[in-house]
């Protein structure tokens, strides 16, 4: 919505149960456009969506390429690009917008870019950090925008202005730190959680929530990436 105000989702696909729960919560709260949720990208039936979808958006698993994983690349069973490729080829969108970790440039990006070129897309990609839009942390990510050489001309991206991309951050300074130090701390209280990732490591039952926070992308960051890459493609 920040980047393309008139856009609306027609379906979601999310395999991880905790992440799907967060997605369902936002649908209930009305912070995301209402649409059905599918659970398995590998078996997702794309045929009914042919000609219905203008843009395929995805953050396919980063574990095959992330420095935090074993970096097995295409041999990792979580490598889902071939299934996304099938969906793109079947639905015939005008645009594709993807996100992944920076190391994807070294391993796997050539396959993705070559596949998109083979399907008739022009591709622009770049590294963008959340700090570029004012966030108090780096969170660098690779964003990929693909525009079909024929379909993109007739559809149009419908970009909004950049006013909603920058700003909107709640900064905390010395007064906030001092208020934490001055606050009484009694037995049984939890220590304040960190600003940068929103929560502490905690116990094992809190792992899934921390994982979701770590995998997240700052909305302004994605909107800024879309704006820059679409300008590079002269959209």
Which ranges hold each PLM region?
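SAM cofactor-binding core of SAM-dependent methyltransferases
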Residues: 1-42
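Short, hydrophobic alpha-helical segments
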Residues: 226-234
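A short local structural element in Rossmann-fold oxidoreductases
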Residues: 24, 66, 223
């Amino acid at each position: 919505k920040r980047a393309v105000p008139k856009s609306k989702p027609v379906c979601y696909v999310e395999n991880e149960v905790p992440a799907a729960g967060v997605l369902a919560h936002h649908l209930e709260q009305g912070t995301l456009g209402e649409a059905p949720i599918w659970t398995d990208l590998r078996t997702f039936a794309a045929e009914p969506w042919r000609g219905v979808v203008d843009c395929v958006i995805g953050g396919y698993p980063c574990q095959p390429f992330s420095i935090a994983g074993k970096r097995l690349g295409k041999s990792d069973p979580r490598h889902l690009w071939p299934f996304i490729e099938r969906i793109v080829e079947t639905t015939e969108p005008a645009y594709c917008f993807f996100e992944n970790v920076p190391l994807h440039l070294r391993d796997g990006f050539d396959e993705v870019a070559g596949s998109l070129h083979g399907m008739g897309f022009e591709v622009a990609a770049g590294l963008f950090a959340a700090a570029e839009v004012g966030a108090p942390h780096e969170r660098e990510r690779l964003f990929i925008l693909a525009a079909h050489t024929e379909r993109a001309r007739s559809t149009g991206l419908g970009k909004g202005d950049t006013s909603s991309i920058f700003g909107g951050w709640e900064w905390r300074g010395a007064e906030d730190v001092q208020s934490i130090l001055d606050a009484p701390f009694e037995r049984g209280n939890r220590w304040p959680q960190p600003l940068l990732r929103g929560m502490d490591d905690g116990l094992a039952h809190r792992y899934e929530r921390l994982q979701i926070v770590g995998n997240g992308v700052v909305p302004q960051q994605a909107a800024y990436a879309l704006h820059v890459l679409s300008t590079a493609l002269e959209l």
